[in-house]
Amino acid sequence: MAIAHASPGEAVDVGPLGSRLPGEKIVALFKSEHLEVIRLVLTAGKSLPPHKVPGEITVQCIEGRIDVTAEGRSHVIGPGQLLYLSGGVTHGVVALEDASALVTIALVK
């Protein structure tokens, strides 16, 4: 069954998952014509392989620590930190601890 995306004007809880984190999955919170917001959830040691998207990206760490590698550089971010990546940049993510983050992607047509 598909998870319903948030509707315009609907508030979505994006706070830390805490002890629930290991049981959660990566989920798209909403997707519009120009923007997609994803809750990234990774347990310690798990990763997303290198990939790229055409649009610009922000990664805002909510809890834990993640290592985002982009253009051969490592960027370790923790709670309250945000990383901006240009569109078309190859990047990968490794969870250094159990972590969740909000990933915002500008959708380019």
PLM segments and residue spans:
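A cytosolic small-molecule/anion-sensing beta-strand core signal
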Residues: 62-63, 78-79, 97
